[in-house]
């Protein structure tokens, strides 16, 4: 058997990184959020956590089918959702209930 290694495509992925691996913030890229917006996002994170705990309890009681927790991912889901425009699309997965709630 002969193994052939061949490059069929090369590409790069561009991304924006506000916070680097060492926790340093790029102040130019830091979003400008008002106190009201920050409070709204926090309230949504609390709502997501509350829903998550309720759904997990219902699953353990046999009242709903399989449920995978969002716990620990609230900020990433609410923050990502907050950055969407009204005409943007979202394709949620099994641990994306937080994005749907936000």
Residue ranges of predicted features:
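N-terminal glycine-rich anion-binding loops that anchor highly charged ligand groups
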Residues: 10-11, 16-20, 43-56
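Short, contiguous, helix-prone interaction/anchoring segments in small proteins
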Residues: 34-43
């Amino acid at each position: 058997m002969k193994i052939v290694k061949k490059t069929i495509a090369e590409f790069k992925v561009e991304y924006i990184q506000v916070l680097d691996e060492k926790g340093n913030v790029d102040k130019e890229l830091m979003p400008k959020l008002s106190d009201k917006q920050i409070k709204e996002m926090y309230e949504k994170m609390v709502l997501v956590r509350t829903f998550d705990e309720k759904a997990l309890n219902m699953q353990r009681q046999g009242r709903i089918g399989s449920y995978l927790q969002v716990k620990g991912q609230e900020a990433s889901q609410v923050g990502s959702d907050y950055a969407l425009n009204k005409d943007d699309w979202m394709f949620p997965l099994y641990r994306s209930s937080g994005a749907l709630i936000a």
